Amino acid sequence: MERRVLIVESEHDFALSMATVLKGAGYQTALAETAADAQRELEKRRPDLVVLRAELKDQSGFVLCGNIKKGKWGQNLKVLLLSSESGVDGLAQHRQTPQAADGYLAIPFEMGELAALSHGIVPPGTDDTGASLDAALNGTREAPPPMPPSLKAAAGGPPKLPKRERRSAMTEEDRAFLDRTFQSIADRKAELLAESRQLKRPPPRRELMGTPEGKIQILRDELKTREAQLARLSEIWNVRERELLSGEDRIHEKDVELQGLKMQVDDLLRRFNEAQQATIQKEREHGATVDDLLLQKFSAEKDLIEVVASKEKDINLLRREVSRAEEELSRRAGELEHGRNEYDKLEKHLGVVTLEFEVKEQKLQDTVLANEGEIARLTKRGDDFEAELNRTISERDQRFAELDGEIQALQERLQQTEQERDTTVRGLEARAARAEEHGTQADAEIHRLNAERDALEAKLSQQVADLEADLARTMGERDQLRLDKDAQEAELTQRIEERDAKLGTLERELSETIARNEHTEAELNANIQQQLERIGELEGEVEAVKTHLEDRENELTAELQALGQAKDELETDLNDRLQALSQAKDALEADLSRQLEELRSAKAELEADLTGQIQALTSQLEETQRQLDDSQRTGEQLSARVAQLEDTVSQRESTIESLQGDVAARDQRISELSGDLEATSQTLAQTQQTLAQTEQQLADTQNTLASTEGALAETRGELDATSQTLQQTQQTLAQTEGALAETRGELDATSQTLAQTQQTLAQTEQQLADTQNTLASTEGTLAETRGELEATSQTLQQTHAALEDTRGALQETSDTLAHTTRERDQRIAELADLGAAKDALEQELTGQIGHLRSELSETQGNYEAERAAHEKLAAESSAHIGDLTSERDGLRSELEATSQTLEQTHGQLAATRDALAREQHAHQESRKAAASTQTTLEGQLAEARAHGEDLGEHLTLTKHELGTRVAELTQLTATLAQTENTRAHLEERLHTLTEESQRREELLQNDLTQKGTELSDTLRKLTHVTQEKMRQAEVLNREVATRTEQLKAMEAKLQTQATEARRQAEGLGQQITGLNEQLEQGRKALAGREDQLRAAGAAQQKLTAERDGLAGQLQQAEARLQQQAQQANQERADAKRAADELAAKLAKTEQRITQFAQDAQTQATEADARAKDLQGQLSARAKKIQDLELAVENAQGAKSRAEKELNAKVAAAESKAHEASTRLAAAQKERKDLEARHAKEQEDLAAKQKAELERRDAIKAQEVARLQQSVQEKSKALKVAELELARYKSKSATTATPAKAAAKPAAAEDDELAVRTQLNQVIAPAAAAQAPAPAKKPAAKPAAQAPAKKAPAPAPAPPAALSDESEPTDRTLVIQLPTAKEDDDWTALVDELDK
């Protein structure tokens, strides 16, 4: 069995949150907002734990805790005290008192602490035995027996109940009275219930009416019947209380469930927001990871390309060495063949001239031995070359295998990177799928909650339909009355709009109705004393009507006060608006001054900034031009150096055998220098492009400066026009003040219209000022400005004419506008001071305008565009002025409509007065007609009473309907505001997500564009390098052909130089001298080249700092420059070594001149062979270059394909991520919409339930009031019967003669008492309305004193008793017994309560 917890908390939402937590912990909860509600709940159902708030509205929680701990509602009742103002010290101090609580919590606290503390004080689960023991110890009442079946109605249907005063709610006094009444019959409740089930009571017998004992018996039977009805009412009351408690418990459980669902929804939203933030963070991390991977990929590709290039370079070097070894081997083979041929010739010559060369035989043998040694050496060298060749080939193959392995590793790494990227993309897709699944689950949960809510609504609707069906079955005759009530409500709804016009009529009607009712009451008390019961009912109704009219009078008084307050608020609003206009005018003038100062400061800053930019650009341009000149000089020097090197190569053909390796190295250096020259040319082109962009920026900056100066000139012109317009405005304002001084005195209703007209006029003047400020831009447009100013002046005159027309209707506004006029005078004085300050400022600006007019010629190009813009603005201003004029006309029409409405209201008031006069006349005629006959008077009184009650009911229902509609309007307004906030929040979220997606898309597009640009630059450079290599190959081919031709020419020359050895030796000496000079020139050129290379390196470093995209290439260029510097040093060493060798050879040349003729042929043959070798090398080199170009193209194609695939995959991943984010945003939006609808439906349901509970409380209060009235009647009748019985018991001791003598007076007295028992004792008559209590006591005092007086003198006792009464003793009154109609009324009342 669940423990019960009572939560006493004034804040409903906080109480629901605590109830949700405790219900989740296994407790059953109930709520109470005040201490009184908590006490009632403790009296009805004893809880196991009370969660008490110390700060309550009606009573302190500490006091209530002390009452609970004192045992007022049972012993051992646990209390958990909450406080937000006492603090820890206050709670600790209260803990030391005898009435300390069982637990304390300081607000704010965690809900988990509340659950834990509650679990520690009272465990959530106990057995049924403990519960039964607690119930037995605490005196818990058992459930009352089931409600008895309802009595059947009469055959003709239940009669109409008498009209009674409706009460809004039950009070504590009413509840105490009900408890006392039901407790008085509790001991005989079962017997009374059994008697109440009798369908029909026998009518009283006629013979019992003649004796006092019979009358007492009749009164006893009537009293017993009433007690039986009270027993049934008490049973029905208990059943209704239990139903109400169960309904409140169910509503509380539903509220707790709704609060729990709200907390779950808030938790889900929080978790969803956290998941969304985590998803966004993961997306950002993924984007950063992808960017890092792309950068790593690009860097890896770049490194791979560099490695491939270096490896190809090494391969080229190895191939060059192999080709060099092959050439050396072929040369040695040629020399060997040549030696063999010489050997054959020598043998033949030896056979022929054996005798001649016997002397030379030893020499020849030595020569043969030397040749054989040389042959052996050459053979050994050939073998070494072959071994070296084999080793080189094996190393090349091994190197190729290593390169293949590295390429394979790089490809595997690329595949692994792609796999990782695919895995990451799949992970993101999985996350997106999980997010979508989570959104689907959330949607399903929301649908389930909606379904549960719909089921609860359907169940509640079914219950409401059942209750309405029961009410419809029991209230058959009220259906027609309800239709009439609806029709009258519609009519009253239409009359609500006219209630302001009927205030005076209702007041007069109130006074006349009160006077008429009092007069009618006096006449009825004087004329129809025999109809005392009806008179009592009429008196009660008159009091009810009086109360209703007094309430109506109070309401009308409150409405008049509200109208007066609204009038005061309108006057205050008018004054505030005038002050706001003055402040706005001051703020506008201050804003104009501030804008002028800002324009001046902006101009100075802009001029300084532009001057600095121009100086920086000029210095940058000079530096760029200097670098360009240096680059050009470097290119010219390099070209001259290339030409010098080519001449040196052509001049050194005679020493080709010793300088062949140097030629190959020099060719390589020339190609590298050509590449550097091309790179320098590209850098020069880029520098020129940068220079062009800089010049364009300089031109744009100058244009901006010119436009700024033009804008400044226009602003100054506008300032002049503003000053002029200000003076005109001051004049216009002075005229307006003179005109308004004559228009004082106005009705309170039209003062607001005048203020609106003045505000419109001020706005029109402000728009005129703005238009004039805009149109006075230049002196060329001054004529157009004046024309528009005249048009505006005409419009202003029309406005003044319209204002003069309005002045006729505004003659009573002097008192209202006096204060406004004084404030306006102050503002005029301030404007005059401001005008003087502006005049001084204009004088200062006049000198500046003269200086700026010289600069106006530069802005003529922008003048036409500005003029068109000003013309457009002038058209818009004219249109706006027309709109303001139409608005003024609309206000005038509204004023006329208001006047017409006021006249119609006066007409309606007059018509209402006439109708009231007619009604009064008709009422007087009706009263005269009622005086003629008693029956006519009774009928008219019944009609008047019914009409008054209907009016009261209709007025009450109208008030309730009006309050309900106001509450609904407030609720709809709050719902609309909440919906607008939700929509604004969703729009903001959507805008944020859209901007985020656009930003990411722009970043990706920029990255893609950057990568495409880098790729295109790389391809362009690679194409350029390929073309350069082809060009160098062609140059080399041409150089080889030229050298071949030179070699052929040299062969011809060598044949002719055999006889000119001496002259050639001298020529060689001259050539050596020239070579020395060329060597010196080469050294100087190398030194200059080094300086140029250093300057080029510095320029390249600076360009590297400016162009981040060429950083890698510039680093390579620097490395090449360093290599070139090293090669230049090596070249200088080689040149020195060659010069030393040439000097040594020059010393030996004279010795070998004699052998030169013999070696000339050999050298020619060797030259031919070398030329052929060079041709073969060049062809092989061209072939290798083509292979390399093909390989580079293949690599570029593979790289482009890989980049395309990677970009496609990245784009697909980004599109999927974007689609997932779009779906997620849509899901969030749908969820928000569902939550908004769900909240709105919950609020509607709560409002309906609240209205239903209020209606039920109203019905219950009405029934309780009726029961209280009937019980009071019964109790008074019972008291009278007891007094009568006591009197008759005292009479039983007297003799028969005095009894007969006193029979007639006793009968009269009995009749009087019987009649008095039927009176309505709740509402006193008009004569005793001010003191109802004293009126009741004298009525009972004579009857109580009668027996005491009769004891000593029985015979004269009856006259003495009768002398105390107000009625004469000789009248005979007929006792009006309860009829069947009254019985049926009570039966119908009880049956209605049963249902």
From Swiss-Prot:
GO terms for cellular component: chromatin; condensed chromosome; condensin complex; cytoplasm. Disulfide bonds: none annotated. InterPro entries: CheY-like_superfamily, Sig_transdc_resp-reg_receiver. The keyword Cytoplasm applies. It is found in: Cytoplasm. This is Adventurous-gliding motility protein Z. Keywords: Coiled coil, Cytoplasm, Motor protein, Phosphoprotein. CDD domains: REC. Residues 213-911 form a coiled coil. The modification 4-aspartylphosphate is found at D48. It holds the Pfam family Response_reg. Residues 1291-1306, 1326-1352 have a biased composition (Low complexity). Residues 4-122 form the Response regulatory domain. Residues 137-172, 874-893, 919-947, 1212-1249, 1287-1312, 1326-1395 are annotated as: Disordered. PROSITE patterns: RESPONSE_REGULATORY. Residues 919-928, 1228-1249 have a biased composition (Basic and acidic residues). GO terms for biological process: phosphorelay signal transduction system.
